[in-house]
A protein has these predicted regions:
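Cytochrome P450
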Residues: 1-433
């Protein structure tokens, strides 16, 4: 998961940053729709860019971002405390539950707290357990495709890309499918706080209420698991024990919120962005359709897996990951001072020509497994095996059912976020196979 708080910190500037000719306006609709030409320029002219608007450093080169991911001692993942400290006291009072539970998310932790939480949750959330979910993921995908019925025009996000990951995580946690609308609403409202690049007291109140509601929702289900264990991930989390170390009630609630939120928001964008890319490269769409519909099942699965990696590289769901400078040091001649914030633009790294030949071309035969969409190092996304699996199941299933998929209407509107890269809606026209 790549969820962080992305609005500018109050105050703070760096004296050593020379004025750049580049004016990075992340909220500009044109930049939200297509940031890649500007990222190309930043990568060439100012790869360690100081943004006065964000009061932060912005990195765009693959090697620099990978290096930062491997230096947890110099680059801290604990970006909540400086963010909360920057909020005026009156605003901070409005987000007590957000602070309570987000501060327990492992994505905002450094060692040793991160190590402990990762060790515990890794016992139940790993590649083998994710692969065991394949039949359920396929059942959910087929159910959603069946629900589309005979429609030839529909919003791909609301009909498929949105509900799929939410239903998958709900099935894993063992919460009722009938709660989908409530769960999605709570997740979307929390996203207003975590992913938005604009400050708004209204969004604080909305996200705080949603966090409180989701916490009570999971508290109820956790209590049920203690008295009547089930065969689901939530029961496994409740029963975790590593030499006497267990998750506290607040840690259990925070972890469930994290899994649901991350699994929903990020994977929705993964599936939607991937489908948009396939509509823009129709030859690649047809290639994926043909090469995942043969009688050779192992070959189908192998190509589907490779195709998903390329879709994640080309236009993945992650805008940025964030670090806080823990030790003053230099990067490409720029002095990064302790306490300053650093945005690692993952989607820019994935288009770096030093890492990929013809990076702005979608090539499903490319070996794209080295992409940084899920991060790298200690903080690589815990749920990346599940996100990959959902793509490996979803795209072949959709392309088997539909002989063609194309976008309709005006260009999609992209969400105003530095953290997430996704659209509000994706109207499509399909022709049934």
């Amino acid at each position: 998961m790549s969820a962080i708080l992305s609005e500018p910190l109050h105050g703070g500037a760096t004296a050593n940053a020379a004025q750049s000719a580049i004016d990075y306006r992340p909220e500009d609709p044109a930049i939200l729709a297509n940031p890649f030409p500007l990222f190309d320029r930043m990568r060439m002219e100012d790869p360690v860019h100081w943004s006065p608007r964000l009061k932060s450093w912005v990195l765009t080169r693959y090697d620099d971002i990978k290096r930062v991911c491997l230096e947890p001692a110099r680059m801290s993942s604990d970006r909540l405390r400086p963010f909360f400290a920057s909020i005026p006291s009156e605003e901070a009072k409005k987000i007590g539950d957000i602070m309570r539970y987000l501060s327990l998310w492992m994505v905002f932790k450094d060692a040793p707290e991160h190590t402990r939480l990762r060790r515990l949750t890794g016992k139940v959330f790993h590649n083998k357990s994710m692969q065991a979910m394949r039949p359920q993921v396929d059942d959910i995908a087929q159910w959603l495709i069946g629900r589309i019925g005979d429609k030839t025009e529909f919003d791909f996000i609301s009909e498929f890309a949105g509900p799929l990951p939410c239903l998958v995580i709900m099935a894993m946690l063992g919460v009722p499918r009938e709660d989908l609308a409530q769960v999605k609403r709570m997740s979307d409202q929390i996203a207003l706080f975590i992913g938005s690049s604009r400050t708004s007291s209204e969004k604080y109140g909305t996200a705080e209420a949603a966090t409180h509601e989701m916490a009570e929702y999971f508290r109820h289900h956790i209590t049920l698991r203690r008295t009547a264990p089930r065969d689901d991930l939530m029961t496994e989390l409740v029963q975790l024990n590593d030499n006497g170390d267990t998750l506290s009630d607040d840690e259990l609630i925070a972890t469930c919120i994290l899994l649901l939120f991350a699994g929903h928001e990020t994977t929705t964008n993964h599936i939607a962005n991937g489908m948009l890319s396939l509509t823009r490269f129709p030859n690649e769409q047809q290639k994926l359709r043909v090469r995942t519909s043969t009688a050779n099942q192992p070959a189908n699965a192998k190509f589907a897996a490779a195709a998903v990696e390329e879709l994640l590289r080309y236009d993945g769901p992650s805008g940025a990951q964030v670090r806080i400078v823990a030790q003053t040091h230099e990067l490409r001649g720029k002095q990064l001072k302790e306490g300053e914030r650093v945005f690692m633009m993952l989607n820019a790294a994935n288009r770096d020509p030093e890492a990929y030949a013809q990076p702005n071309v979608l090539d499903l035969d490319r070996d794209g497994t080295a992409h940084l969409t899920f991060g790298f190092g200690l903080h690589i996304c815990l749920g990346f095996p599940l996100a990959r699996l959902e793509g490996q199941v979803a795209f072949p299933a959709l392309l088997k059912r539909f002989a063609s998929v194309e976008t309709i209407g005006p260009e999609p509107k992209w969400i105003n976020s530095l953290v997430f890269r996704g659209m509000n809606a994706l109207p499509v026209r399909v022709r049934r196979a």
